[in-house]
Each structure stands twice: as structure tokens, then as C-alpha cells.
Amino acid sequence: GDVYKRQEIKKEISSFKKDGKRVPSLSIVLVGNHTASSIYVNAKVRACKDVGIDVNLINLNDNISELDLLEIISELNNKSDLDGFIVQLPLPPQVNVQNVIDSISPAKDVDGFTNDNIGSITSEVKKLLPATGLGVMTLIERYNIDIESKSCAILGSSRNVGAAIAQMLMQKEQVTVTVCNSKTKNLKEITSNADIIISAVGKPNLVTSDMVKEGAVICLLYTSPSPRDDL
């Protein structure tokens, strides 16, 4: 699914160039040297370069003040030749994450984390939906996975990922969704009865074979430090 989508985007951007149009541009703000964040960001940079998106990585020191970070975001909001940007999470403790998200222009919010964009999940007018959830829905559509009247277990209840995916699924199809978190006691029982399992906690090996019934569809959301052909 990912390969075909990239080919489509690459072809579309190539047509922009042929028509003399500006190619899409993206900035990624990375604060500090968080290992997992660096892995995610590097994957995003590679994906952008692969399809021809003009990508710019902005590396900031982890001792940056919230005010200074908000000033940088304001500059990105007002940059006319920039189509969108991402502020990679997590952020250092001196920075209020919600303040940062709230400061991002919804029109440039590529991750789809602002209240305006997340709120549009349940609206008739869809805006920039949370990117991970949109990716999951695209995979379901591309592989023609029938989810109508099926049961789906989502592992992870974060507002921007797990909860957002649950909302998208319930908006699109008649699917029964169970959202699990770290306090869920009967996790194995829930997953063993699920037709679809979506692990949205960013950890490999969380779902084991004894937790899955035969014929179930499994979607694992995480980036491995080393590429694997079986994912």
C-alpha cells in the first residue's frame, strides 16, 4: 500500500514540475536528540525525498524556551512558499505541548493535531485529518478489507492516534470499536475476539500469536530502527 501511494504522489509531483509549478514543500521541526523521534523524522525525510517533496529539517537544541519555539512556528505559519510543517513530538518538559499544537496554523498542520483538524473527523467537511489515522484508513481501503459489521480492537488511546483512528472507523463504516489502554485488564480476551487489531502504541512485539484469532487482520504502527521486509 505504501509503495503504490508513493508512486502516485511521485507521479503527481512530476507533473507539477513539467507544468512549471512549484513542488510541495514541508518543514520538520525536531527539538533535541530523542532517539525514537530521530528515527521517525529520518523516515519522513526519506519519504519526502523519494517522492520529490522539498523537505527542510530544522534541528533545535533541547533547552530551547517555549517562547522561542513559538516564534519559529509563527515564522513557519507566515512563510508563503511553505505548504506545511510538522513539530515532532515529544517535546522537552519546559515546553507545553498543547500550546505548541494550538499555535500551528490548521492549514499547515500536516500531522492533523490541531483542534480544528481533529474536530473535523466527525464533521461533514473534512480538513487535514490526523496523518496516522488517515494512513490506516488508506491501507484498509487499498487492501479491500471489509470492516462492515466487524469488531476492531485498537491498542492505544492517545488523542492524536488511537482515539482518532477509532473516530475515523466509526464515521466510515458500521464497525464495533474497542479502544484499549495501559489499564485495560482483559486485553488478550478483547484481541482474541477481534476481527481487526490495530496496535497504535509504537511498540513491536506487543501483539503475540496467542492474542490473535485465525483470519484476523493486524495493523502494527511503529517505525523500526532497522528496515524489515516482513512488516
Please provide the spans of the model-predicted regions.
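Anion-binding alpha/beta catalytic cores of soluble intermediary-metabolism enzymes, centered on
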Residues: 87-152
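Single conserved hydrophobic/aromatic residue that forms the stacking wall/gate
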Residues: 1-4, 222-231
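Glycine-rich phosphate/diphosphate-binding loop of Rossmann-like nucleotide-binding domains
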Residues: 37-43, 130-206, 217
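Short beta-strand elements in bilobed, periplasmic/extracellular small-molecule ligand-binding domains
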Residues: 49-60, 177-179
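Positively charged, low-complexity intrinsically disordered leader regions
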Residues: 2-18
